[in-house]
């Protein structure tokens, strides 16, 4: 039997605010346990929540970015459940009327652009954190646990998709696109190690062609793209094997164990009725008028999708390159700065340089584009010298590596022209000089000449390689190809 996978994601993005969603306590990560929890966070008697305006504006900004409807009046509700790190005994969330309704996120899967529809995005407060450490002991030295309430009350935007993804690859592509978008907007810092961006995956399987959904399981708190992919792949295999062996999938919440590469049962999955949602009597509806929405819109940066569309249509960039260039605002900024110097004719070359050598060097060094030691003017000089024929693409890569090493070492960065002069890297474009090198190579490679003349095109490429080697990579590749073909008849 053929099976179809059905996936929906719920993503919790911590909103980038200085204070919590309903109190003035700090949201700074890494403070000593329980030093950033005030009376409101601790649910002490006599205190009332006050909504953080900046958190609402972040939610509006996200809604606009995904072409969603912004609710003119959204309501906060109490989600009732007991857990040690939830001081109030309920979580303030949104149920019936969330702040953001609908919307979509574009993703690139292979060469195909797909659209992931969103159900909603709602504001809520984060819970505290249970701490289970080996060296954390009770008064008699027994193994114990602790509660850190610093995170309690941190503003969250929970972003829920429709169950429209059909593979782990699609889910990861969506998660990466969403992560890039919220960081781009300044809505969330995107730090997955610190829990600022984490996903819950709802996974089910059904026979190919069946309309009804299968029983879903929710995998909680996946805080890396790799874990998300591995957890979904395992869960799909588990459910299919279970059904094919005559078993039944139980609706439940599961955790992913990365050490063992498997999901395991955590608890039975609750429905909305189990949480007994009701409107929070301490909070008024959030009224968002058109003037507020337009004020937020006026302060938004150009969106990744807008830039991708512009660059593809105006400069002829591929969807893949446009996607890479808009992974984060800093990379896009470098491209725009480079483009402002070299102009439209070198747009594709600029994109290739940034997505190639520049991006690879950043990744190897673990450096963000914002902190790149080489700036747009260095890259522009390199592109200009390739364009005017002074150096070849291969030599340009060598010069880039030299400049990068100087910058990383904290040395004064040479100009491109200085490196060309000092190392004698100027491209040979004189046809007479190139012909002399070709003649030398042909004289000692008669076998390749005969193979080419007998119809083997690979032999031609081998000869080009020998000529470039003999010229130490300096011969103009275009002229080499042209002159060699003439000589070979």
Swiss-Prot record:
It catalyses: L-glutamyl-tRNA(Gln) + L-glutamine + ATP + H2O = L-glutaminyl-tRNA(Gln) + L-glutamate + ADP + phosphate + H(+); L-aspartyl-tRNA(Asn) + L-glutamine + ATP + H2O = L-asparaginyl-tRNA(Asn) + L-glutamate + ADP + phosphate + 2 H(+). It is an enzyme of class 6 (ligase). Its EC number is 6.3.5.-. PROSITE patterns: GATB (PS01234). Keywords: ATP-binding, Ligase, Nucleotide-binding, Protein biosynthesis. The keyword Ligase applies. The keyword Manganese does not apply. One of its GO terms (biological process) is glutaminyl-tRNAGln biosynthesis via transamidation. GO terms for molecular function: asparaginyl-tRNA synthase (glutamine-hydrolyzing) activity; ATP binding; glutaminyl-tRNA synthase (glutamine-hydrolyzing) activity. PANTHER family: GLUTAMYL-TRNA GLN AMIDOTRANSFERASE SUBUNIT B MITOCHONDRIAL AND PROKARYOTIC PET112-RELATED, GLUTAMYL-TRNA(GLN) AMIDOTRANSFERASE SUBUNIT B, MITOCHONDRIAL. Heterotrimer of A, B and C subunits. Belongs to the GatB/GatE family. GatB subfamily. Allows the formation of correctly charged Asn-tRNA(Asn) or Gln-tRNA(Gln) through the transamidation of misacylated Asp-tRNA(Asn) or Glu-tRNA(Gln) in organisms which lack either or both of asparaginyl-tRNA or glutaminyl-tRNA synthetases. The reaction takes place in the presence of glutamine and ATP through an activated phospho-Asp-tRNA(Asn) or phospho-Glu-tRNA(Gln). This is Aspartyl/glutamyl-tRNA(Asn/Gln) amidotransferase subunit B. It comes from Polynucleobacter asymbioticus (strain DSM 18221 / CIP 109841 / QLW-P1DMWA-1) (Polynucleobacter necessarius subsp. asymbioticus).
